[in-house]
Amino acid sequence: MTTIDLNSDLGESYGSWVMGNDVAVLDLVSSANIACGFHAGDATVLFKTVRAAHARHVRIGAHIGYNDIAGFGRRNLDVAHDDLVAETIYQIGAIQAAAKASGAVVEYVKPHGALYNTIAVDEAQAAAVIEGIKLVNPELSLMALAGSQIVEQARAAGLQVEQETFADRAYTADGQLVSRKLPGAVLHDPETAARQALAFATGQPITAITGESVLVDANSICVHGDNPQALALVEKIVTTLAAHEVQVSHAR
């Protein structure tokens, strides 16, 4: 049976502000990218989400971002190398402490939003994130955009890399994500997202936003927890994969 990792960005509520339906999503995914307090989340949400993931045997990842909670980490920031190294270490350390207190372990790091997109093309910021990860624990893997430059950069630095695709995002003809600033960039229809996820999982091409067939090789598929349709998308993806004998399972 074919297997694929299904991950979601979770733990992004803070204070009295609630985002997503994390507990229900955790019942369906195999990996949880948990916000570490910089782009979203707070200490209580972080700890509760780690415990909930661990209770469900869901793999735990540090979802690190720019220090930009007002912009939800989706604004590009020109962060100095040493600062970005330190911020990477700080965020991983926060979730590692929550994991230790829960009897769990952090297995990977997945950057968020603008940081994720920047390090896919910017070798300097990518180097800072890689350095921060290695200083904390070189056994942590990096989850990154499939086919992006950081994949080889991180591998050359000795990190294991998990290449990721997105069930709920549209792609360009060259296999890149369509900018969120453009219409149609985010997929809200469960059928469309499930069809795209099945293609990723079985090594088949997807259809780019401009109609071309695009083949994207990856071993993990993401559904954004802040998508209003997140739970419906994940439910449809899981049932569609199962119907085609694809099992949702950890990437490692």
Curated annotation (Swiss-Prot):
CDD domains noted in UniProt: LamB_YcsF_like
One annotated GO molecular function: ATP binding
Domain of life per record: Bacteria
Alphabetic keyword roster: ATP-binding, Hydrolase, Nucleotide-binding
Pfam families, alphabetized: LamB_YcsF
Record-listed E.C. numbers: 3.5.2.9
Protein family (similarity comment): Belongs to the LamB/PxpA family.
Protein purpose: Catalyzes the cleavage of 5-oxoproline to form L-glutamate coupled to the hydrolysis of ATP to ADP and inorganic phosphate.
Protein name: 5-oxoprolinase subunit A
Organism: Corynebacterium glutamicum (strain R)
Underlying gene: pxpA
